[in-house]
Amino acid sequence: MNIRRAFPLLSLFLLLRGDPAEAQSTRSGMGAIPYADAGGTGVTFRTWAPNASSVAVKGQFTGWGSTALTKESSGGTWSIDLASARAGQEYKFVVNASDRRDPRGQRVVNSAGNSIVYDHGSFDWGSSTNFSAIWRNDLVIYEMHAGSYNAEDWLPSTFDECADKIAYLKALGVSAVELMPVNEFPGDRSWGYNPSDLFAIEASHGGPDALKRFVKACHENGIAVLVDVVHNHYGPSDLDMWQYDGWSSGGFGGIHFYNDWKANTDWGATRPDYGRAEVRDFIQAQIQMFVEDYHVDGFRWDSVYNIRNCSGTWNQNGSDMLWQVNDWLKNNHPDVYRIAEDHAFDTDVGFEAQWDHDFLSNIRYLATAGSDADRNMDTLAYCLGSGGFNRVVYVESHDSCGDLNKKHRLPYDVDSGNPEGYWAKKRALLVNTLALISSGIPMIFEGSEMHEWYTFSNNQALRWSLTNENAGIVRAYADLIHLRRNAYGNTDALKDPGNVDVHHVNNAAKVVGMKRGDLLFAINCSATAFTGYSMAFPSSGTWYCLYNSDLQSYDSAFGNIGPAIGGTVVADGSANAPLALGAYSMQIYSQTPIPEDSSASFDPAAPDGCGSSVTITYMPGDGPLAAAATVYAYVGRNDWQGASNVQMTASG
């Protein structure tokens, strides 16, 4: 025997063959799961391919030679333990001699590349594990698109770059960020509603560790994270799940999808087959991954209508799937918030709330109507008081102002010729902030608070220069959000969904008055300013102004009509008071003023040409460490020169 020739051939055989295959893995889990136990270290590979004649795995750990998996005795799964495999190595399954990304792959190179073994246990969550769930009555949601939120040089922003703005979000006062879909999609830019890999996090946004760092940073700053999930359709492009194990019927998608007319959606024939237990479990496992591995605090389910209906025909399978997943959440993670985009309550499938599109369309029209005569105060009264916390109320979202839907931002729709002008600012500020005083859970879309008027697009970065140009508008949002969440400790009226009394509706003058607990709201939806408008207050005596959207501190062009914050009006013995109301403005009153030592101002960006000193005021309740972090973030974000000597002075 020629030993010199035999040894190289033997080495080549072992490299191609990889580790010896067990009959099947005795370890649990689907996909690629690193293990370190009494049996050693390595990775378990398991995939569902009931109709396949052969399944193998190949990757960097085999020199890209194929190693066969063993078909398990039940369930249509194939598995193997490979001691040579490690986290961070690329791999693919080989199903009937066809290379496939892992449908359960937790990380990918990209939507057309390889899967990557990922170890969830390697991430250090630190003290963020102590984060407490946000109570429903304390939720103020900020919808964010990770790719556009902090993008520069036409590159999509990563979750790490989004995390650089958490100090801003904390100062703004929001209590939750709702991320548009984060799963892998084709290319580097997308809204995210075309997922290709349902367990992997979009690589262009930084992948799984970057998302975890974002969630960790949010939790460390008291902000919850919700995730938008898409299960009404997948893809339709870059879907390695398509005809995954070789079986399909009628040219449809095989085991993961319906294989008849029920597969058809507006986005392709890629509706998951909710009638299969394995597909329902696949979806539930994704939700479980987000909660237990990424520590997310809630979900918004996209287009629930197209889960519960197929081409307009009722689909009980979809309702069964939603009930299964939501019931699992209720029993295992009851604090995780469950929101549907639509049709949450056609029957009980376990959702707590849904997006209120009627609020959007009705309230938005108050701003966009061509004349004051078209603004209906009865509609406003209804929208402010109905529904409670089972609805998420908003005036802008990705759908309402995005390029894919050929929509525009509210300021543009108000005045397309001058979206940065007086009328656009007045009406947009008034109408956008009505969500913050309603009985529902308010949501703001990224940029609304800085009067962004460019159409939302995954190709258009949010213009952070607007936080300087429209610093007063940002401050108006912050003031109202802090009032909503009772940050000053003087009133929790806006946290009670059942205390709404719209007691004054004047359709002729376009003025509405509302009582919520100990608060009085006066809302003027007309271009007419009033100097002595009579409004009934809950009781006589002195009432303090907590908010006035017409103040020139919010915009120098505003009318400055009515009292400043802390100013007073006096209700007479009949509990009526004459109010000075600016055009398209809102005022809020209470008999309990904002404590002087608890008031806060919010400068959202360094002013142009700032001098030798800049004052940053923060909430004393946040504590000195939070204040120091805020100062540090301001200095770092704005790259102030000569800011090495920062002096902080505490008062109150």
Regions found by a protein language model. Give the residues of each.
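Surface-exposed beta-strand/loop patches in extracellular or lumenal glycoproteins
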Residues: 41, 45-48, 55-59, 526-542, ...
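Conserved alpha/beta catalytic core and glycan-binding cleft of carbohydrate-active enzymes
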Residues: 108-119, 295, 311, 316-457, ...
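The feature marks proteins involved in alpha-glucan
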Residues: 15, 21-44, 49, 64-143, ...
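Conserved, mostly hydrophobic/aromatic
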Residues: 47, 144, 169, 179, ...
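Bacterial N-terminal signal peptides
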Residues: 8-17
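Tight coil/turn sites that cap or link beta-strands
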Residues: 540, 581-586
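Hydrophobic faces of well-ordered beta-strands that scaffold small-molecule active sites
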Residues: 140-144, 177, 225-227, 299, ...
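Substrate-binding/active-site clefts of carbohydrate-active enzymes
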Residues: 109-112, 128-136, 145-298, 303-333
